[in-house]
Amino acid sequence: MQMGDTVFMFFCALLVWLMTPGLALFYGGMVKSKNVLSTAMHSFSSIAIVSIVWVLFGYTLAFAPGNSIIGGLEWAGLKGVGFDPGDYSDTIPHSLFMMFQMTFAVLTTAIISGAFAERMRFGAFLLFSVLWASLVYTPVAHWVWGGGWIGQLGALDFAGGNVVHISSGVAGLVLAIVLGKRKDGTASSPHNLIYTFLGGALIWFGWFGFNVGSALTLDGVAMYAFINTNTAAAAGIAGWILVEWIINKKPTMLGAVSGAIAGLVAITPAAGFVTPFASIIIGIIGGAVCFWGVFSLKKKFGYDDALDAFGLHGIGGTWGGIATGLFATTSVNSAGADGLFYGDASLIWKQIVAIAATYVFVFIVTFVIIKIVSLFLPLRATEEEESLGLDLTMHGEKAYQDSM
């Protein structure tokens, strides 16, 4: 065990933990004032629910030795997860690796809530969160990072393009379709863009822990991830704003923040495998394709992805996974692989197989989970509750005295 790496990873885990409250602000600013507390509660309660699931059995199912589909139960209740280095890093405590990975599981579950904002009942969300973290997140994490079949295939996902972003985006799309549109349609008027700006800034800050920490040690790969993360976020702003300026004639603050998130999502699977120049291309295209996902794709198919969980995370994560297959190079990370632009066409096909499998699995299992939840609890607020606002009807409080 090395003290330097331990302190580094401890700090990275705290940064990723901070992303979930940041997400609450980011989402909270984009909803109506009568729904800001209920929206924040989805993110905050994810910390509570998923933390418990992770300690009891989530971590062992994701990372314990098992088969190519799911981990075993030897680390259930964190049995054997102590302060000595574990299987995934020989320089940090096993328990620290567990906590770092827990923050990913928490954030992934919270991201989904953006898709059904302003209409899902809180109790139904809690039950859904338990089941989804257990039955969807843990298998996908095992496939990619825990010794499962995607990792064995040779597909690359440095920090969670598949595990975090595609899985949360696709799950959000399923819930948006099943719950249907909001009572007053899909148009949403953000009630406080300063909240969204501050939340976006916290998310960007936390993302350094998310991507850089995925190196698990403070080395050259970590530094590439650090540079690429910031560069792709900046390029994502440029890509989004450029398209927005051309189409809508005005660049917006919401567009700038959304572009940063799009760039960050897109670089996530590639952060420790590509050059800084590639991160510019990945970020710019990420901003542009997520703009298309948020505006054109959603309009074409008519689903109400309220805060664009699929438009940002599903679309951005998909592009990031494909981009990894194009731009990855062993000159950055010898543990990775060369992509198409560096002479190896096989990686891009491995990336596509991994992405497609994640889409299919997450879509089907999320659909089954939400149908099971509906057998026990009503999923959606009534028209009257939606009209009054979920802050008051679900939680008995208001964020503002005039919040209607």
Curated annotation (Swiss-Prot):
Keywords: Ammonia transport, Cell membrane, Membrane, Transmembrane, Transmembrane helix, Transport. GO terms for biological process: ammonium transmembrane transport. It is a multi-pass membrane protein. Belongs to the ammonia transporter channel (TC 1.A.11.2) family. The chain crosses the membrane at residues 7-27, 44-64, 96-116, 125-145, 158-178, 227-247, 254-274, 277-297, 352-372. Coiled coil: none annotated. Pfam families: Ammonium_transp. GO terms for cellular component: plasma membrane. PROSITE patterns: AMMONIUM_TRANSP. Functions as an ammonium and methylammonium transporter in the absence of glutamine. Required for ammonium utilization at low concentrations or at low pH values, when ammonium is the single nitrogen source. Required for binding of NrgB to the membrane. Interaction between GlnK-AmtB complex and TnrA protects TnrA from proteolytic degradation. Disulfide bonds: none annotated. This is Ammonium transporter. InterPro entries: Ammonium/urea_transptr (IPR029020), Ammonium_transpt (IPR001905), Ammonium_transpt_CS (IPR018047), NH4_transpt_AmtB-like_dom (IPR024041). It is found in: Cell membrane.
